[in-house]
Amino acid sequence: MKIGVFVPIGNNGWLISTHAPQYMPTFELNKAIVQKAEHYHFDFALSMIKLRGFGGKTEFWDHNLESFTLMAGLAAVTSRIQIYATAATLTLPPAIVARMAATIDSISGGRFGVNLVTGWQKPEYEQMGIWPGDDYFSRRYDYLTEYVQVLRDLWGTGKSDFKGDFFTMNDCRVSPQPSVPMKVICAGQSDAGMAFSAQYADFNFCFGKGVNTPTAFAPTAARMKQAAEQTGRDVGSYVLFMVIADETDDAARAKWEHYKAGADEEALSWLTEQSQKDTRSGTDTNVRQMADPTSAVNINMGTLVGSYASVARMLDEVASVPGAEGVLLTFDDFLSGIETFGERIQPLMQCRAHLPALTQEVA
């Protein structure tokens, strides 16, 4: 099973709590995180894109770097780890994304890929005057389908004459082309999102579910597997989890309860409000899971809370789910979290037993 890190491109990472570590996103922080992840044989690093935050006491995600420029910088200071940036497709024409991706492919030596998102938080785009109207909620995967067809044309042949409802290419050119086939990823959990991933993505991200229920996402992975079978493609699921670990289960649980006790209710209210804006995509979208009150303090990503041995065991359970090819991890404290993962958790994981021994060099 592959392991990735979801780098904190926005302030405070993924904990919406006054009791969680409070920090600003910087290149130096993310550089240290990704270099440490590479040292511990993580397979990939991904950054999201967020253009407006949730506010509240913690000013959650009000402060964000930009994904492509951040990952270009990280590509230049790493040598093995796969690097993924996220394109907010309403803000960037596909021909520009194609050229930026080809550039980072050159910087990274073929280690770059693109995560495509349609956009769900209306204020991100309204503030720039580019929200296409609420009908977009029901047509966003039609838009993304045209978008990725233009990308594939340009990366594959260097030229596109695509004509569609959303994009018109007239002998559009991109050169140089990427040195290796460019990987495209998506994070669809709705039926439309999974159908898109089944047709066009190399793999699909999904949320883990619950606290210490590592296989609860299995029905989602099964839906993705079934959708991919309809297209004759192999599209695995990569599952998002937060790791909160300590020497003992009780110590880890105490940290988790402390974070929940400091939940930033004002920021969480904003998230809930935004989740109700899309009345057209059904009930199975990512944002509806994010806003569920069960564990909203970390946007309801799957959460693994326990001793190092307990977390290792739960991650091995994740690996046992059919269709689960990887996990994307966040941590309550990224630098110490990656180090303890690499030193104390990963060596106990059966699904990572193939890794070579660590060098003595300090990450």
UniProtKB/Swiss-Prot annotation:
This is Pyrimidine monooxygenase RutA. Its EC number is 1.14.99.46. The lineage of its organism: Bacteria, Pseudomonadati, Pseudomonadota, Gammaproteobacteria, Enterobacterales. One of its GO terms (molecular function) is alkanesulfonate monooxygenase activity. The FMN-N(5)-oxide reacts spontaneously with NADH to produce FMN. Requires the flavin reductase RutF to regenerate FMN in vivo. The keyword DNA repair does not apply. InterPro entries: Luciferase-like_dom (IPR011251), Luciferase-like_sf (IPR036661), Pyrimidine_monooxygenase_RutA (IPR019914), SsuD_RutA_monooxygenase (IPR050172). It comes from Escherichia coli O26:H11 (strain 11368 / EHEC). It catalyses: uracil + FMNH2 + NADH + O2 = (Z)-3-ureidoacrylate + FMN + NAD(+) + H2O + H(+); thymine + FMNH2 + NADH + O2 = (Z)-2-methylureidoacrylate + FMN + NAD(+) + H2O + H(+).
